[in-house]
């Protein structure tokens, strides 16, 4: 199983006690440079990138941060920059804005890990701080009432390109696409109000059932994000898709919505796995670095594991969690004794780390209620 930057072992005593080993469908790795150029020159729902930008444009590449390096953006951002150069956009007219959402600032070494050494040495790099109001511009409100505050580097650019990878997401259905704008380069108020839609409309209803992994239709979190992204009007998208071995197997590019949506369909086909039966015990792998960089990031693996384990069963998560800079809102949220107490506090002051903890708490309570004798073990 993947743990940190390597592999960890789980020892099994008797084969007949193993119900199933669930892995993504085998998909060969691709030639990243070739696939990136192909998706920019023969895009989905869009003209080629070179025909969209023009000499004199100031281009902002909004790029996912260090917590998303599983997307291997360091392997393909260079090809985007060079393609812009071929369209007569010099390095001096290009900047990269890291879509950090509410995450911490990156170190210079982490910047290099995200975009590669050459890009980091050639292109202006900006860190997004969701709480720095001097860096934010109000561009409107969504139909759900979310005030949309966006980083000025994205707002002031002539062209915005969104760069990430696509995988499933805990409550937005899928990551990537519109998430590069909200929450990626949005203000803290915008992010928290948007993410509140992950809860049901009334106290006691818990998590909104429409805001689950792989769900996009009528998902209020995703729809709200898309509306906010449309206010910025990114001109192009370049996203990677990785296989079960963590290698890039596809690149999608083109219209920021249509190309992303096509990418989500590819992800579903690659990651969907058949399951013989629900298990009594499930070992859940967080996916290795950077997905297991912290308890906060790694605990998201409980959600898919919950589907594979019987109510009252046991989920054992395997992760390294080497980054001790856990969000305080995540660690402090486990002080509540009941799910109701936790939900009440979350509705009063919603934060993303708090929600992730609440989701974990809800999963745990589902199993503990069904089999209370597991309490001491858990």
Descriptions of predicted regions:
Residues 58-70, 95-102, 283-285:
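Short glycine-rich or small-residue beta-strand-to-loop segments that form or flank ligand, phosphate
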Residues 206-289:
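Membrane-embedded hairpin module used as a gating/binding unit in multi-pass transport
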Residues 105-175:
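An acidic, phosphate/nucleotide-engaging active-site surface
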Residues 93-101, 316-319, 369:
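Short internal beta-strands
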Residues 150-155, 160-238, 243:
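Conserved phosphate- and dinucleotide-binding cores of soluble alpha/beta proteins
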Residues 70-89, 301-308:
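Histidine-anchored nucleotide/phosphate-binding helix
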Residues 292-365:
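C-terminal catalytic subdomain
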Residues 6-14, 366-373:
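Conserved small/polar residues in nucleotide/adenosyl-binding loops
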